[in-house]
Structure formats: structure tokens, C-alpha cells
């Protein structure tokens, strides 16, 4: 071998270890595992594809009337009607839309139709003799003869405690992100709202009086009854409605123009004032003199909201059109042992509202720990049911407890085989000893009946109840909707659950590892909710979020490796994969623990993201993880990790590119050696050749 060949061989031999060391980042063993997807490490006992999961065992398309516990003998009659003595108020729920033919049949049988509820394919008939229920149940298309329920109203530090406003305990609140509920309308369905109150001035965009009594507002009678175009502005003859709207949206202004700290969660949200109760038969401390009319008014008000949810209200700007949120601080008692199972028409109408794009926030009830089940409304399968905490009159949440009066779950089983919709309440918020905006009726010198108003009133008198926790959540929903207008009601519900502060041990771990019968999925966190809503908006992920896909982080450790562990499962089907990314980088699939046996439906499996910090650029990085199925995925979880900047990927240069650089360097070095080993004659010839014209 001549000198030139020997020199070239020596260069190649000396350079080859360098190429090997660079290529090793995609295949070398680290900490007992192998490399996978740049910085990821796959442990030997981990799976690289998602474990197989069993299908759900219930039929998600079953008809409520085929499974409801309200009619155990399946004769089409609410069981409590068959036990009643004397007149009972009833409605008919149909398996299809109510028709003119049905209307004529009822009239021919001598029944008056008091209210039609097309959104739930139902009509209200009022009082009948219980013996007439059999004939009604035999009308073609009748799913069930239902009994009316009885309506019950559930009745400073609240806003900073939910992290809407900032405080010394929580220096950043949702308002600090530029959110206040502007452009979002809350339908306060209650005893009316005195929106002349200094903290509620300018909020009214529309209203409707679902029940018109002279005792509460003579203007209703003088105007000729109800106006259904949204132009009527009801007053509050009780106090309950004004107090609730204040907790959702008060600005804190006083009559003299000074600023108090008595804000609602969304101080710039608008008011759609839907009165369903009055000072006769409606208040929490009154006799129910007009129970039948009260129930019908409540259903009438909810039907009106759904019918007018997209209306352009008279005299208001386009941004204030429609109805975004229903806030309900009352319930409907059940006639069955164990409370409502959510299949009654007053629960179903809330489910329909959620599916039609109106978010429903409703109170869990004030029956405490040993309650006889949740009421209708509180038992709705899809709406957001709110429990109340006692904040001990402090902003700091560490001392908060569930309020003694707050109704506990779960809801009565509705017979559909799905255990998830029994996990109510879903969320909790402060509801104890809350300062109220004063309605006109609370002041001795003010009475709507005499033409007075609440314009000189202030914020006094403390009240407690899930009534008062609910509007705080309604205001937070307004903040979330303002932050991300593309979120659906069910996505918003999932955002609130996902970002809540966990409290209490899981009450049904075989169904869900996080739900607690007192707190639901935890204490609502306005700041975390709007931060997540903004992230989904800015990252373009909103349309891909499936609320039935679950992924939650469990643990992060960082020593020689970064080890993130969590679990995932599907609530309506299987998870295809769990994915992660570092910063805005490409998505990679996580690895999985091998489960000891077959995974049943609703059973979480463990996922892992194990990274070499030396392969990440020096500094802090956000790792984002979600569970996916098809083109949809769960809400993400985030972990902050520290890169140590020791690897190729940390410099942003792919391994293949580095290998190419080395090969080029080898070629250059080899050519240099060859050039230096040329004979003098060869070198001179080369120079002469370059000088030729």
C-alpha cells in the first residue's frame, strides 16, 4: 500500500468513532431502555402500542322511557300517580313530536292544554283525577304520564376565592387575562331581577315574565300580560333573583358611584331576566299557594329561553344577541323515594338546552348529607350541577369545606346502564355567608308595587345555599365563553371539571378515579379554566376536544431521566393512543405499562413519557400530553421539565444531518491528505493546469 492510501485509511479509521457516537442517539441503550423518537426512552417492560380496552356495556342510544325508574311497572304512568289520593298535576311526555291530532284527542277527552313543551315532546295538563291517568297513557305515542314536581329555591370573598379576581392569596385572577364576561348573556331564571340596582345597571338586554302576578309587578298586568319578544323587564318581588344575579355579574358599584368589592364573577356579562317566581307561592320562606302555576311557569320560562336562544333583542348591539347561559338556583322536588333519576321532563329540558348550545349551571340542592336524592333539575344528566362550599369567610381555599347543607350525590340510577351520569354534583363553589345585592323589596322604603326601584340599594345581608354557589359558576362560564367562543357546552363542562381543585377521596373509583360525592370533581378554578380555554383557542385544538376521552397526569420525577406518568381511559369508547410533544415540536406516542389482565370499560391504563434531559435544549420546556381516538383527543395535561442541553437534538440538528456533516468532513480531510502527498511533479502540473488560458 502506498503512502497516500495508507494516510487516507488512517483518516477514515480516526473519524469513524465520531460518526458512531452521533448515530447512537437513535439506538443506544440508556438507563436500561432503548431510544425512541429523539429524546424518548422506552423501558424494556413498556408497551409501544396502547393496551386493548373492552367496549362499554351500556347502549348509549336507549330510550329514556324504556329504562326510567320513574315507571318501574312500565305501564306508562309515573309510579307516584298510582299512589296519589285526590287531584294531581300531570303532563304527558311523548315518544315523538306532539301533533295537532294529539291536541284534538286531548280536547275531545275534556283536558285543557296549559303549556306545550316541544323541546322535550311534552305538554302540561294541570290537575286530573289519578284514575284518568290510565286513559291518558293509552293515547298513541304517549311515553309516560308524568307528575308535576314542586319548586324550591335554594337559598365579598366569593369572587376572589374562585380566582376570578386577584387577591393577596392568589395574585393573578381570570380578570387579569382581560376577561370580564363581556358579550356573554346569562339568563337568570328566578324571581326576577331589580336591574336598577347600582351594581346591575346597564346589564339588562332582554326579559320575559313566565308568570304574571299583580303582587310582584303591576306593570305586567297594565301592559296586557306577557310580551314574548324579550322587551319586558321583570322586577323582583322576592330578593332571590337579584341576589343571584349580583353573585354572577355585579360590578360592585354603590349608589353614590363609589366602588365596593362586592363583584360578581363576570362583572361585564349581560342579563336576560326570566321570571318564573313571584312573591306569592315562589319564595323560599313562603307557602306554595300556587304550586301548579309555579311549575308551569318554570317550564314555560325554560321553553321560552330555548325558543329564543338566538334572537336579536330589540334595541341592543349584535354582540349582545341571544342567550349563552342558563343559571338556575332552584330545583323541583321528586315524588319518588331516592329523588329524581334525571328522566323527568324538567331534567330533560336542561339536557336539551345543553345539546342546543346553551350552557346550564344549576344548584345541587340544600338537603345535606342524608338527603333523599337529588331533585329534578339537579338530576339533569348533561347540565353542570353545583355544590356549595363553606369558605370560612377567607379568600384562601385551603380551609374550605363542603357546606353542611349542600346535597351530596350520587344521583338515583336512571336504569340506562351508564354509571357516569349518576356522578352528580360535578363542581363546587363558595355558597356560605355570601353578601347579597339588595332587591327593592328588601328595603323598608322601597317596593316595586308602589313604583319604587332598587337604584339606591347596596350590598347587605348574608345568605347561604347552593343557590349562591351556582351564579358564581355561571359567571365563570361566561369568562370561559368569552375566552374561547368555539367551545361547546359539554366541552366547557369538561374544562371546568379538568381544571378544578381536587377535594376529598374518590367516592366511586370503579367508575371514575376523581369524582367525590360532596365536591364533585373539585372546587372551581376560574383562572385555570380560562387559561386552558385560551390555550385551546390559540393552539387550534378546540374542535378536536372529545369530553369523553380522559387523560390525567399522576407523577413527574427528574433525575438522570425525566419520567412523567399518567393514566387514560375512554368514557364512550376506547383510547387509540396517548401522544406527547415538547413545546411546539412534533407529536410522539407515549409508552404504556402492560396491564395485568384484560382492561374493562372505564378502566384506566398507565402511560409514560420518559425523556433524556441531555437531549433537550438547556432550560425549561413544557411537555403536553393527551389521549386520542381517531381525529379527536382529550383535554391536555402539562408538565414543566428541565433540559440539560447535552444531546444532538438539543442543538436542533437531526442525527442524520450530523452524520452527513461528519462524512463531508472525512472527505475533506482525505482530500487534504491526498493533496499533501502528491509528488512535486504532480503538484506543479496541477498549478500549471490552473494557469492555462
Predicted regions and their residues:
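Long, low-complexity serine/threonine/glycine- and acidic-rich segments characteristic of extracellular
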Residues: 544-555, 562-647
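C-terminal subdomain of the subtilisin-like protease fold in secreted/lumenal serine endopeptidases
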Residues: 63, 323-327, 482-571
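Surface-exposed intrinsically disordered loops and tails
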Residues: 56-83, 168, 172, 211-235, ...
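Autoinhibitory N-terminal propeptides
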Residues: 5-124, 129-173, 644
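Extracellular S/T/G-rich loop segment that most often corresponds to the catalytic His/Ser-adjacent loop
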Residues: 208-214, 378-478, 482
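Secretory targeting signatures
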Residues: 1-35, 645-693
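Subtilisin-like serine protease catalytic core
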Residues: 173-208, 212-296, 319-324, 355, ...
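Short acidic, glycine-rich surface-loop motifs adjacent to enzyme active sites
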Residues: 302-340, 363
